[in-house]
Amino acid sequence: MNQLGALAQVSRFTQNFSMENIKSEFQSLQSKLATLRTPQEFFNFKKISKPQNFGEVQSRVAYNLKYFSSNYGLIIGCLSIYTLLTNLLLLFVIVLVVAGIVGINKLKGEELVTPFGSFKTNQLYTGLVCVAVPIGFLASPISTLLWLIGASAVSVFGHASLMEKPIETVFDEETV
């Protein structure tokens, strides 16, 4: 019964999509992409060096996480897409669940009438759960998520700790 409640919450979430919400999300995405740094700046090998101590690592990471935040978000997004494309079963389960919820919501609470009988909405959600959960376990979402977290952390924190800060910021820190 708890799973049906969770599915009902997801269905309410999908009903909250409107053109205004989509437009506002698109505008926020555009503003985020406007802060994207150029590849020449992001992959500037002349600014890569080994930090002297852990304090410098912390300083570099703090600065670079703010400065390259859009680039890091793009890297995490690309890694997420790569993860789904290499785990096709997980992608199938996600598409199945989303399509199932959207399809059930299109019924608007009415029964689905088939030649095999009529099915109520809660029966359809139960059937979706009974199919998606076992296949979802086979798709190994936990190991995929852990790989994504690890690959993202190594990529982002590796770049942030090795990329030097601009010289101007070093002088600003000393005067404070």
Swiss-Prot record:
The modification N-acetylmethionine is found at M1. The chain crosses the membrane at residues 84-104, 129-149. Pfam families: PRA1. It comes from the Eukaryota. It is found in: Golgi apparatus membrane; Peroxisome membrane. InterPro entries: Prenylated_rab_accept_PRA1. The keyword Ligase does not apply. Its main location: Golgi. It is a multi-pass membrane protein. Keywords: Acetylation, Golgi apparatus, Membrane, Peroxisome, Phosphoprotein, Transmembrane, Transmembrane helix. GO terms for cellular component: COPII-coated ER to Golgi transport vesicle; endoplasmic reticulum; Golgi apparatus; Golgi membrane; membrane; peroxisomal membrane; peroxisome. The modification Phosphoserine is found at S18. Interacts with YIP1 and the Rab GTPases SEC4, YPT1, YPT6, YPT10, YPT11, YPT31, YPT32 and YPT52. Present with 5500 molecules/cell in log phase SD medium. Belongs to the PRA1 family. This is Prenylated Rab acceptor 1. It comes from Saccharomyces cerevisiae (strain ATCC 204508 / S288c) (Baker's yeast). The gene is YIP3.
